[in-house]
Design a protein with these regions (language model features):
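Aromatic- and kink-enriched transmembrane "portal" helix at the membrane-lumen/periplasm boundary
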Residues: 17-19, 63-70, 102-125, 134, ...
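Membrane-interface transmembrane helices that cradle and orient dolichyl/undecaprenyl
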Residues: 89-92, 131-149, 154-157, 175-181
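Hydrophobic, aromatic-rich transmembrane alpha-helices
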Residues: 277-300
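Transmembrane-helix motifs of polytopic, lipid-linked glycan transferases
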Residues: 71-92, 130-134
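Perimembrane helix-loop-helix junctions
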Residues: 139, 166-198
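Membrane-interface alpha helices of multi-pass inner-membrane proteins
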Residues: 35-38, 101-103, 146-161, 171-174
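Loop-to-helix entry region of an early transmembrane alpha helix in multi-pass inner-membrane enzymes
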Residues: 48, 52, 60-82, 114, ...
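Transmembrane-helix signature of polytopic, membrane-embedded enzymes
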Residues: 2-10, 84-107, 126, 145
Length: 300
């Protein structure tokens, strides 16, 4: 089963390495390169998983530190495509369609471009796809071990990128709903699932430690200087968990913006995003493949 995914991983990594950034970059990628090298706190929402895995990547291996951080993105982009092929094969999809799906995703603009430089997306996608696989396996088998493993990966997914929060919420609540209701054991299993989820989110505690000890690069220190250049930091922004809460919920605004739900605006955003995905991302590659797949399905 794993021969085809291994081949996809090797080919994808070779392709990404052809265009990978050779050294230090700018903007968010430069920030992530520094964090991978020395640790610290990134801009909201903190992205602790990237920082922790990045520290491992920059500790071992050759080449300059900035390149190793770029290599992290390329490696996990290739690993995500390999995992996608393995996942689809396990779901009964043939080898050719599974590889076509990996090709469509792996050559889409955002996925390809973020595989070339230090970014959080490929690592986050890898963990999220693993969480999806294990969640479906847990729902289908009802096994407690798989359910707890899925809960852990769902928590870890949030440490990768908060963009997956809607998926995590739906998957987590579905797992909780499907826990067998067997008296007191039911409550025990629910609490165990919650504990597994919280355990997956423990990388966020690294942000608390890095902030309180002044370890590495700290975006929160920059916020302190920008908001209160001469006056002391107010008590409401001084406690570790208040600062962590701001990182996760503020959308990089101080004071944090309140959340509002406007159905028309949500519909417009969905429409705009769908158009961009169809025009610039998966659409140009996936549409011909979808037509070919539909034709084959009709022919058989």
């Amino acid at each position: 089963m794993w021969l085809l995914p291994a081949a996809v991983f090797g080919l994808a990594l070779a392709g990404y390495l052809r265009g990978i950034a050779p050294g230090l970059l700018w903007g968010d990628s430069a920030e992530m390169q520094i964090l991978a090298a020395i640790g610290g706190v990134a801009h909201p929402t903190g992205y602790p998983l990237f920082t922790l895995v990045g520290r491992l990547f920059t500790t071992f291996g050759g080449g300059e530190l900035a390149f190793r951080a770029n290599l992290l993105s390329a490696t996990f982009a290739a690993a995500t495509l390999a995992l996608l092929v393995a996942f689809l094969r396990r779901r009964g999809v043939g080898g050719v369609p599974a590889c076509a799906a990996a090709l469509a995703w792996g050559t889409s603009f955002t996925f390809w471009s973020t595989a070339q430089r230090a970014e959080v997306y490929s690592l986050a996608a890898f963990v999220a796809l693993g969480a999806l696989w294990l969640t479906l396996a847990a729902l289908e088998s009802g096994e407690r071990a798989r359910r707890l493993g899925a809960g852990f990966l769902l928590g870890l997914t949030l440490a990768g990128h908060m963009a997956f929060a809607p998926f995590v919420a739906v998957a987590g609540l579905t797992l909780a709903w499907r826990v067998p209701r067997r008296g007191a054991a039911w409550l025990g299993d629910e609490f165990a699932l919650l504990a597994a989820f919280l355990l997956g989110g423990t990388p966020f505690l690294y942000l608390v430690w890095a902030d309180t000890t002044g370890h590495g690069l700290s975006y929160l220190k920059l916020v302190d200087l920008a908001q209160w250049p001469v006056s002391p930091v107010p008590a409401s922004f001084r406690t570790p968990f208040a600062r962590l809460a701001w990182l996760i919920t503020s959308r990089n605004e101080y004071p944090a913006m309140s959340f509002h739900f406007y159905p028309r605006l949500v519909a417009k955003n969905i429409s705009d995003t769908s158009f961009l995905l169809a025009l610039f991302e998966i659409g140009p590659v996936a549409f011909p493949l979808a037509v070919w797949g539909a034709w084959r399905r009709r022919a058989t």
